Amino acid sequence: MKAKKMAIVGMITLTLAALLWGASVSAQTERADPYVEWSAETRTSLGFRVNGDAVRALLPTGWSMTPVADSPSQVNLSITFMDRHVVLDPQGQPVGTGSSRYMVMSVQARDADGNNSTLIINGISPEGIGSYEVYQPAVTARAERSIVGQAEQTSRVQEVWQMVSASGDSVTLHLTYQQAIPIRRPSTIVIRSGKNTSFTRTYKIDQATDALGVPGAPDSRIESISLKIAGPLYSRIFDGSEALTGVTSTPWYHREIFIP
């Protein structure tokens, strides 16, 4: 009986993924850029003020960042952990194993003409350097998530994210929080490689985000947080002067990727 129940659950999961993918494909003829991938994910993002010089060293020539107003030596940087539950190609077939876990670092920067872009400047991925050619190959890329809820109450969530690169850079997050009803935020954005800025990907996103706040703030729903960042590069960015500016949970995130 248990094996039969598991088989039914597996069939439902695959059927749901196929239906969502089919709905996404039906809209592709409306876009000029080639459609390359669809995914369903869960994400957790952290915003920081960090060492500006260490981040600027990772920017391409001619690009700059605006310093934090009340801390000129610092700039804003985001870390996003991703648990990609289902990843499909344009034919609806799994990309690789069909799932993946990794972490990316991104910044808002502008080129010499003053045009603003989101740049992916680093990360840790089991898939190697990735499409943006900036990720560090992972030796560990682990995600763990426990959800406890009763009836119609919102849930209590515990997460563990552990990312370790072959170079020795690492990020480990332990996070516990009380959920709220997330806000649905569909969007279309263009992301640019921090190494080869002529390479862009357009993301058509349907997501729901839950801003958890900052630990210790009166309106924060974060019960506990432990973050350890180390390694030859990351210890320069996170040199002890960093400040956490916000934590956001994205319990569901559906993305279509288009490449010009």
Q: Model segments located where?
A:
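Hydrophobic beta-strand residues in large extracellular and virion-surface proteins
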Residues: 77-79, 105-107, 161, 173-175
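Interaction-surface and assembly-scaffold signal
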Residues: 138-260
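Aromatic- and glycine-enriched beta-alpha-beta binding-site module
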Residues: 86-162
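Positively charged n-region of N-terminal signal peptides that target proteins for export
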Residues: 1-5
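Bacterial N-terminal signal peptides
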Residues: 10-19
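Hydrophobic, proline/glycine-rich low-complexity stretches
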Residues: 28-87, 237-258
